[in-house]
């Protein structure tokens, strides 16, 4: 039975770099929107200065954004050198995006505008063995209901677990849910709502949310988002671009082996990281070692993890041992991310991150032990501080950016 627990390839430019090359028009268009997200009101001249472009280039970009209804003029403002200029602002509330997160046990639907403001958020739980068509029908109904309530929605983004094969529109493997690999999400949703519909891998969605909306030191060159929840995954943004690979399935950190003689994973590999530090694994360890922390009967993995974290904070030694084991494996994952991608920052998110105050010291200890000083001293490792689930946030951000890359589709929606 479904239960309601609700409540009411993306590019971001580095802070001062743009390009006058026509091949980068879409990137520059996204960058202008990003500047207006940060500044609220800004002149063409100030945008040109911040991006390092000519004012003529910015004028052309802004003209397209105004035609799309994304940007409007707000009258005279004080610009550089105290000169008066025409101000620009985002028409945020007139351009809303639905973000959808599909996960094991639940899906979530949220409404955002292009400035990142959230208007609504609802979560629907379902048993992991629930029939796929029942879950898909519930997702579609919730999106239709949301469209009825919010009339300014211009696009929909869906984040799904990976490895997601973007050209085929399906997930290659959904651990714990093997029957879902036959579901073609693209075919199921693309023509359902009469809105542009985009699908993104959940790790990539989290990376996008952190890149666009995370409170991190700027500029960043390479960001790694490390998703540790019902599954384990990651998303990498380097130089402003998502690292996707030929099929869109790059950076599957959860299926990197940490024990070549370990248990066989559903993906076919042995000793996958996901088998050692995901929420289901933590729940399993808790049942074996600290059952007194758990409720009798069925309990969601994330709720069980929270119970273990609370017990550990209270000094329960067995709970602390469970947390240390999970934290060490997250640390091994960070070691792999650092050696593979040399990021400025690793952001750990999803349900396990709720124990960040306990986990982070353990993770950093492992990294310090296993990474050379020249690398580990240059990477920042932190827990996501976003108030909205990064995966849900990123699903909406991905849809926003895709529309900015294709103005003709955007204008067709607005007509």
Kindly give the residue locations of the regions a language model identified.
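Short, active-site-adjacent cap segments at secondary-structure transitions
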Residues: 163-166, 205-208, 233-234, 243, ...
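Glycine-rich phosphate-binding loop and adjoining helix at the ATP-binding site
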Residues: 118-144, 148-222, 358-369
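Short glycine-aspartate micro-motif
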Residues: 97-101, 153-157, 223-227, 233-235
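Glycine/GP-enriched mid-protein hinge/lid loop-to-helix segment characteristic of carbohydrate kinases
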Residues: 121-123, 131-135, 181, 185-203, ...
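Short, acidic, Ser/Thr-enriched surface-loop or helix-capping motifs
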Residues: 113, 166, 237-238
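ATP-binding/phosphotransfer module of carbohydrate and carboxylate kinases, centering on a glycine-rich
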Residues: 1-153, 193, 261, 269, ...
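Short helix-capping/turn signature of helix-turn-helix
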Residues: 38-39, 115, 177, 213, ...
